Amino acid sequence: MAVDFTTDELDEVASLIARSSCNVALTGAGVSTASGIPDFRGPQGVWRRVDPEKFEISYFYNNPDEVWDLFVKYLLPAFNVKPNPAHYALAEMERLGKLCAVITQNVDRLHQAAGSKNVIELHGALEYAVCTNCGSKYALAEALKWRKSGAPRCPKCGGVIKPDVVFFGEPLPQDALREAFMLAEMAEVFMAIGTSLAVYPANQLPLVAKKRGAKLVIINADETYYDFFADYIIRGRAEEVLPKLLDRLRGMLF
């Protein structure tokens, strides 16, 4: 699919980023689809094969063995992927001093794999698991070794271990959420990339930034819920738009 944006739009946004001292990016599923992670709600998404209600936090507590079996069979294989040009472009913007932070709704850790340092993970990280009883945190790979079938158990207290990602109905990690809103308040340019801005409370971040005076840039292949609120809209795929934006930004900095 051809991207639908103009050179002038890219130049304007690149100039805005170059002049600003605090630029912040909020990223969603659309940033990782080019790496091979399907949109969970899309035609090829995981929720076509697995009832998403089985990943409600209440269902997990009542049926941890079943949920772990589903997690290992359907979710884990989807995340055996590598960063794509969108991740690398954002990491390079940070290296150039033109991106304060990435706030992500993704759990794949591809931003870190691409080299991003300051990443706020609103929905947790698939790399870890946590004990639901004592709160001890483990590498997911380690927890999987303890699992013969069903849910692994905490070696410290015997509690049920859960993947350290936010399940439906579960509150977001408060430290991450607090930092995300602080960054939104500080931002001079706030970019929402690869997200439809449908999920609360992450979709409040661009509103907070805009109300504090930031310019709002939306980069997405499809329309979003807050297009009407944006200062700039670049309609295209993140992996195609961001490298071009980075090229123009470099040209303005050097």
UniProtKB/Swiss-Prot annotation:
Cofactor details (free text): Binds 1 zinc ion per subunit.
Residues that coordinate or bind Zn(2+): 131, 134, 154, 157
EC class: transferase
Main location: cytoplasm
Binding of NAD(+), residues: 29, 33, 40-41, 105, 107-108, 123, 195-196, 220
One Pfam family linked to the record: SIR2
Subcellular location: Cytoplasm
Names of required cofactors: Zn(2+)
EC number: 2.3.1.286
Residues holding nicotinamide: 40, 107-108
Active site: 123
Family: Belongs to the sirtuin family. Class U subfamily.
Function: NAD-dependent protein deacetylase which modulates the activities of several enzymes which are inactive in their acetylated form. Deacetylates the N-terminal lysine residue of Alba, the major archaeal chromatin protein and that, in turn, increases Alba's DNA binding affinity, thereby repressing transcription.
NCBIfam families in alphabetical order: PRK00481.1-3, prot_deacyl_CobB
Protein's recorded name: NAD-dependent protein deacetylase 1
Primary gene name: cobB1
